[in-house]
Amino acid sequence: MQINIRNEIARELNVPTTELDDSLSFTALGGHSLSALRLVSICKRIGLSLAVGELLHDIPIKDIISRSTGMYDTAGSLPILENTDPSHPDVSFNAIITPSPSPSGPSTGCPTPDTLDTTDSQDADKISIPEMQLSLIQSTLANPGNNILAYHYMCSLADLPATRMAWQQVLEAESIFRTEFRIEHEGGYLVDTGFTPYRWRDTQVPNWEALHAERDKRPSFDNVAFEFQVITVAGDNSVACILWHVHHSFIDGFSMQLVMRKVSRVVAGHPVEAGPSFATVAWERDQIIKEREADARRYWKSQKRVLEAAASEIRMPRCDFAPRSIEFWNKVATFVIDVAQSDLLGYAARHHVTVPSVYYAAWALVLSIICDSNLVLLGVVMSGRSLPVPGILDVIGSLVNTLPMGVEVELGMDTVGFINRVFRQLVQLSSFDWSPPEHGYRRQFASVLAMQFDVGGHTGTTNEPSSRMNSEIPISITVESDQVIHLQFAPEYQETQVQLMGTLFTRAISCLAAAAENPEACAARLGAQSMSYQELDRWSDCVAVHLSMYIDKGAVVCVHASPCMHWLVAIYGILKAGGVYCPLNSKLDPELRNNMFQSSGAAIYLTPSASETKYRPRASRYVWAVEDLLQRQDDNNQDEFDHIPRAEGNAYLCFTSGSTGKPKGVLCTHRGLVAFQRDLEVRLHAQPGRRIAQTMSVSFDGSIHEIFSALSYGATLVLPTPEDPFSHLYDVDSCIFTPSLAATLDPSDYPNLCYVYLVGEQVTQDINDRWAASVALYNMYGPTEATCGASIKCLLPGRKVTVGRPNPTTRIYILDRNGRLAPPGVMGQIYLAGVQVSNGYIGQSDLTNERFFPDSICCGLGERMYATGDIGYWDGDGDLICLGRNDRQIKLRGFRLDLDDLEVRISKLPGVTRAAVSRRGDDLVALVQPATACAADCRKHMAAVLPTHAIPRYIIPVERFPMTPIGKLDYRAIAQTADVRYSATPSNEMSPTEQRVAAIWADILNMDRAQISRDSNFLAAGGHSLLQLRLAGRLNRAFNCSVPITDLVKAATLRDLSQRIDKLQEQACWKAQRLPPKMDKRAISRMEREWISKYEGNTSNTSFTVSFACRLDSAVDLARLKQSWDSVMEAHQVLRSRYCACAERYERVFSDHAPVAQRIAECRVLEEINRPFDLANDDLVRVVISPDTLLVTISHIICDLTTMQLLLSDVERVYDGAEPLGHRPMYMAADAWQRVAADADLAFWTSYLQDCPHSKAKRESYAGTSRVGIVPRETVLALEDFMRSSQFSHHQLALAAVALALKPNHDRIDSVIGGPFLNRWSEADMNTIGLFLEPLPFRIQFDPKAVPNADAHAFLQSVKCSSQAAISHAVPWQELVCHLGVTPEFPNHPLFETMVTFHTKGGGLSLQIDGIEPLYTWSEGAKFGLMCEFTTLSNGDILLRLEYDQGIYAPRDISIIENRIMTALRLLIKNVPWLDLIGELHEVDGATVCVTPGHKGSLFLSPLKRT
């Protein structure tokens, strides 16, 4: 049995059995997923069992064979098919398909062969069409012509008759080609018609160019069918083109292989062999799918988060209105991979992956660029034939499936690791290649990739696809077996864009598969002792000869480093022996030295002197003293040791301290070190005759710089003496200092110094000015990981300090978060690239993968780049400005925060001397010193200087901060401090006031009371401005005192708010009970007075209404509905109001009779809703009821949306049998009319609106119209996720979008936009009938140049701050206008002419009576120059109505504004960089605009509860 398996594996891999290396894995020998599937099927036929998963994983062949077991026939065993030909088609992914989420219909019981073969019975058992076939058919029905394959190949004219006959025999033998796909209401079914519609057309063309044109013509059908065409060229009697147009539901790439092979066999004279019945295979496959459904659902559930978060939208400009080409087929771009197939196969074998995984990994890399995301979604074409169904690998028919796969592109991951991960994903995905979308996924990807292997009989040219097909997927990629890539693209993409995609793809694939002259000169000097270059050479030869007997090339050798001659000899001896030098400071703690030695992987420890061997690490295998080795050399008279190091080999290993205290060993190469020191200035001006001081720590790479600069270029290295480590500075030309050391030294003490290099720390201006006046002063920047240094700058006194420009052999990039080059002046992370970049960290591959990766900017050099973690930018002179580390820059709940900057700002607060801030999940933890600091006071001070999202949730005064073993702040321990301090804090530790406030918060925010702590923030917990108003009312009622809205906005936490309430109660600002003031019933409110002014002299006042309309069905009792309305209108005196002129003012007059509802036969809503009101003579409420419609229209002078909802709620109660609420508070007794603006609030508005812009357009009347659109669904879904995770309100988001839409071409934003202010200040006000709503101006200001790395969220944050400031200082509208000295000139609105409103799902009008369906309506006219009204429907859709004055805006202008708003919403939610945001808004202006009518649109009277 095992011999049989071995033979089959060898045959499948095309390897002689005797040469099969069974110690390797299947993939290492060249196997892939399809060959594994084929091998499993072949073994089944001969009674052997293998698993595809075993074959694809990195398991030796011998282990697979030893674990295999035979399969023995029983009564229920699988039949052994007669066809045992092992040569199955080598394809599973060949044709690009058009997926659809439509699920397949239900199937019935198992059919018998008789019923399957029945052709004259219409009652045969129904076999469900496989889901993918059904989706292809449905897609074609929706878009005729889609999913029709055009397959062509060239055939000899002499063979044409036999070929035609062979095609006919093969198609007639296969059941799929006589199958009808019957679509019924309950699903789709396979029906055997008993007839094969075999059609051929013959066409002759004059030349080959015409042949190509004929071949590319549209098929003669556009539905589910197939036909053949033979195209010949006149005068050419050699070949013909056979063209087969066939719908994808009949055949997939796998089946095409089978069909072509069968046709070839019949042409060769073999009898035709019918394959298994497709209906039978489909039915049995469907049964197994049902059995495994739970497994599939679990798998897709595990993938849900990744798939939902992955990006698939290609961020390239598209023409959404691109005209359809006169050509039927989508265009195809062709590319050739410049890597040999054998090289790819070898690569895949070495790393135990498959070649397709390389292609999928490469395309994922491309998507990460063109989708601007590190998590991308792509479509994977699978055979759908992995299930154990008899005949599934032999059946003709379409079983192909296209599945989504999310790939995370981690910038720090090495190439091999990335491809291996993609390979594992593909293997796992292939286990579910049969799973339909109903199991828990959606086919919503913008690109799909398929592999296509050799097709028997195909002799087409290599630069054309053998098949093509139009689909709804924008980008379809096919990789042919000859390494030609065909990229088929939708019309909305430009060819230049597709060329870029293809070029990136092919490049991504390619990137985955480049002292003797002065022997007596002094090399080194230590006090009176010296060593010549000849001595250094001879002595190091001795060490090298000895080491070479014990180490291999590239082995690390550690040295007990201390400044002496034998130390230098040890270094060069190691390098000559081909080893890697690793210095371990003689002053190291023994335990740390031992740990470093173990990390290095060394076995040998060299010491300069014999007395130092006692310091050998415990882990060392050998220890030798250089002085002993030199004595042996003298005794034995060794010959010269000849060694030429490899340029790419490692030269030295230098340990740097890690952030966790664990040292990192950095491996640097000979090539990098030599390149670094080629420049004279960089190498410390080292040359013969120059003296270079050795001052840097012997274990620091600064000493490497000193040693090799001096000794590689003939200079003398001057070592420090132990007694006076700085005395040698009096006698040298050049040296390296840290700025800290330079600060302690006086330049005048060292007159011989010519060149001083500062490294390791930032240089202060003071140090620069002192030293640059005396010596040539250089500032060098560069971490160990880039071989000593990356940039250099010659500093001058009084000039700004920078780190200069790159060394000649280093490239420096400033990259943004997406790895793109940042413009000059814009901050980003500093990346170092080029030959100097080291080989990473020894023994820490994960850390290496996080920081080192191929150079993505200069891709053609095959070099790497290193992410330094430092932030910097290029200044105006082209110099690099380094600002420090970026490890502490985080994104918290959508906001960027620099924790280091936050620490500095908190440290400057009163009573705080030092602060340390760490992240704990979605919260911040701040430790402050001294321990006596008051956390509550800290929080108050923070609220004054920090945005809400930057205020730590936990503020803990401590005596000392947690530290790591190497003396750094331990931020992990800091975060855990919050767990220790707060884990045992029960809710009953809250004060009584805090507990009551927390209960009210929980109710208003609809959240669990246990989630609210004393440090909770209302906005962070999901609150917004309207909920703050509701909270104010609840608190007023609960505590019987007036809690100003300003207190709610300013309170950072629940504790702060509770303390403020306690103070208000102590002050007894309000009595527990107070009587409404006495007043004249005829008086009118401030807002009523303003509306009267608007009515005066304006005939176009149809927009001055609030309306509600709904559709009624037969379940509604019309008489009871009328009675309910009459009762409610009778109960509220304010609804009888009329307004009459009396002398020089207006007074309220109450009608003797309340308004009553009118029953009419037909309600003409459009006409009725636009009928104006006469304030003096008309009832200002109209309720009209027809058999199918209810329309309520109320003048705005007595009604706002809150009042309308109160009335609807009253009607609902009365309709259900309750009494009307006649005890609602009196309108003129409302708290709102008793308010007087505070001086501080008026002062705020003076400053807030100072020098604000004003609308220049002048209105003639309130005439206008509306345009209504629907926000794209994908934007709505993204908006919902955004609102759940951010602290912005819907209205703030809308304000930001509209501000951008109105000012898209400005460098900075400064505009005043209005918003609605509820103006109801108490619970009583919230239940009062009448007009309260007032306008409130919001000033939107944003200067992107003043914000580092400005992006959409930075702009949103400025909008939020402005919005909160305006609301917290809200004053009566008329007082504000008067205070600012503005005289209203209606119809021009004071202060602003644009209004923005946002009605959320819970804030819309509702009448909960069975049989009523609310309708969307609006009236003609325009209350403002432009009003942008967002309304969320019950199904989640968002409507945007733009009400505008046609005298100011043309329909095209409004259409452009609408497009801008939609675009701005999408970009704000995605938080794109500011320049990208503005750039895409500019593109909107250039797009084709479709202008549609306003109120005549289909949304007028559309249901608000749309499905």
From Swiss-Prot:
GO terms for biological process: amino acid activation for nonribosomal peptide biosynthetic process; secondary metabolite biosynthetic process. GO terms for molecular function: ligase activity; phosphopantetheine binding. Keywords: Ligase, Phosphopantetheine, Phosphoprotein, Repeat. Residues 98-119 are annotated as: Disordered. Pathway: Mycotoxin biosynthesis. Disruption phenotype: Impairs the production of acetylaranotin and of the cyclo-L-Phe-L-Phe intermediate. Residues 514-893 are annotated as: Adenylation. Pfam families: AMP-binding, Condensation, PP-binding. Nonribosomal peptide synthetase; part of the gene cluster that mediates the biosynthesis of acetylaranotin, a member of the epipolythiodioxopiperazine (ETP) class of toxins characterized by a disulfide-bridged cyclic dipeptide. The first step of acetylaranotin biosynthesis is performed by the NRPS ataP which produces diketopiperazine cyclo-L-Phe-L-Phe via the condensation of 2 phenylalanines (L-Phe). The ataC domain of ataTC then catalyzes the formation of bishydroxylation of cyclo-L-Phe-L-Phe. The modification O-(pantetheine 4'-phosphoryl)serine is found at residues 33, 1025. AtaP has the domain architecture (T1-C1-A1-T2-C2). The single adenylation (A) domain in ataP suggests that one specific substrate, L-Phe, is loaded onto the T (carrier) domains of ataP. Residues 105-115 have a biased composition (Low complexity). Residues 163-429 are annotated as: Condensation 1. It is an enzyme of class 6 (ligase). This is Nonribosomal peptide synthetase ataP. InterPro entries: ACP-like_sf, AMP-bd_C_sf, AMP-binding_CS, AMP-dep_synth/lig_dom, CAT-like_dom_sf, Condensatn, PKS_PP-bd, PP-bd_ACP. The keyword Repeat applies. Residues 1099-1471 are annotated as: Condensation 2. It comes from Aspergillus terreus (strain NIH 2624 / FGSC A1156). Its EC number is 6.3.2.-. Belongs to the NRP synthetase family. Residues 1-72, 988-1065 form the Carrier domain. It comes from the Eukaryota. GO terms for cellular component: cytoplasm. CDD domains: C_NRPS-like.
